A protein has these predicted regions:
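Short alpha-helical DNA-recognition segment
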Residues: 142-156
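DNA major-groove recognition helix of helix-turn-helix/homeodomain DNA-binding modules
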Residues: 171-186
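Acidic-basic catalytic patches of nuclease active cores, encompassing PD-(D/E)XK
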Residues: 1-27, 183-250, 327-333
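The alpha-helix within a helix-turn-helix
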Residues: 138, 149, 177
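Conserved catalytic cores of phosphodiester-cleaving nucleases, focusing on short active-site segments
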Residues: 16, 34-69, 73-76, 237, ...
Length: 333
């Protein structure tokens, strides 16, 4: 019987926890740009779980990458299939610059310290060549570019590109390694803001940032809800000199830097009761703060660790330090 999405998210959560990550509660917001936030030391992850990775479209990828830029965090999708095919273990896939791996690849990376070496591209399966090592081995063996090209079955120009760190097809790498008797590929570190791209795209697009015009795409996707409470909160934070970004498909309405991350949501007290644990959990994982703004009078300063302020309380604060001092006090920090 197929796993439910909730069970699968919980399995990914447990895998991260067992590897020493502090993981947020599953927030249950649908649709959402990410399902889990996880931190280990200085590494913060935003993880999205998808059955079929082809469901990740350009707009959703742009939202996820933008959140990764804002926190900042490494974004990662855990998938199961691409079309009708299972994702191969040990292979990194990409959609719109978002790195994607299978649950098995994640477990091997965390439990056995086995990083993936391969990445998928429309042209096949590739690996990134350790160019400096390849050049050193070629020179030491007294091989010319042409000689090694003949052994590998590629052009001299291809060998030059490999020595500059370009990717090569698995079959080509196998021929070179078989002849040299030495490995020449570089592992992919999933938790570094690195380049995980196929040869069909420029190699200077980091996986943790939106490619090309994605910033424009995100700006277009940001909602103009006309919600007076939300707009008032954003205007108030903006008036304090904070950079405020309105979010969509996230368990919070806005994100600001103070310079710590400040997650903010608006709504009724009933909504605050429903979302308090999730927001508080996300703020703790991000090593930031969170607050919930309501219209009605507040009789409880904190719900499940989340500071609750009404509009008038927010308006009393004229600068970020003053606001953060009250939030931290209510959080008990």
């Amino acid at each position: 019987m197929p796993k439910s999405r909730e069970r699968w998210i919980d399995e990914v959560r447990q895998t991260l926890q067992q590897a020493g990550f502090f993981v947020s509660d599953a927030h249950g917001v649908r649709p959402s740009s990410f399902d889990l936030a996880a931190r280990r030391d200085a590494t913060l992850l935003l993880v999205k779980v998808l059955k079929n990775i082809d469901a990740l479209d350009a707009d959703e990828a742009a939202r996820l990458l933008e959140l990764g830029r804002l926190f900042p965090a490494i974004v990662l999708v855990i998938g199961r299939t691409s079309g009708a095919s299972e994702l191969a273990p040990g292979v990194v896939y990409t959609r719109y610059s978002v790195p994607i791996i299978s649950q098995e690849t994640l477990q091997e990376y965390l439990d056995k310290a086995l990083p993936p070496f391969l990445y998928a591209s429309p042209g096949g399966t590739f690996a990134r060549v350790d160019g400096e090592r390849l050049r050193g081995l070629r020179v030491t063996r007294g091989l010319s570019l042409g000689a090694l090209a003949g052994i590998a079955g590629v052009s001299r120009r291809a060998i030059q590109l490999y020595e500059e760190g370009a990717g090569a097809e698995v079959e080509v790498i196998e021929r070179i390694e078989r002849f040299l008797g030495e490995p020449i590929v570089r592992p992919i570190d999933l938790f570094e803001p690195r380049r995980v791209r196929g040869p069909e795209a420029p190699d200077d697009t980091p996986a943790g940032r939106a490619p090309g015009r994605a910033a424009e795409r995100v700006a277009r996707l940001r909602p103009r809800t006309g919600d007076a409470l939300r707009d008032g909160m954003i205007a108030q934070l903006d008036g304090m000199g904070l950079e405020v970004v309105v979010t969509a498909r996230a368990p919070f309405d806005a994100l600001a830097h103070t310079p710590d991350v400040l997650l903010a949501s608006t709504g009724s007290l009933r909504a605050a009761l429903h979302r308090a644990e999730v927001l508080h959990s996300l703020a703790r994982v991000a090593e930031g703060h969170a607050m919930f703004i309501v219209r009605e009078a507040v009789h409880r300063a904190v719900i499940a660790g989340l500071p609750i302020l009404n509009v008038e309380e927010l308006k009393r604060h004229r600068d970020p330090d003053d606001l953060l001092e009250e939030i931290a006090e209510r959080e008990g920090r």
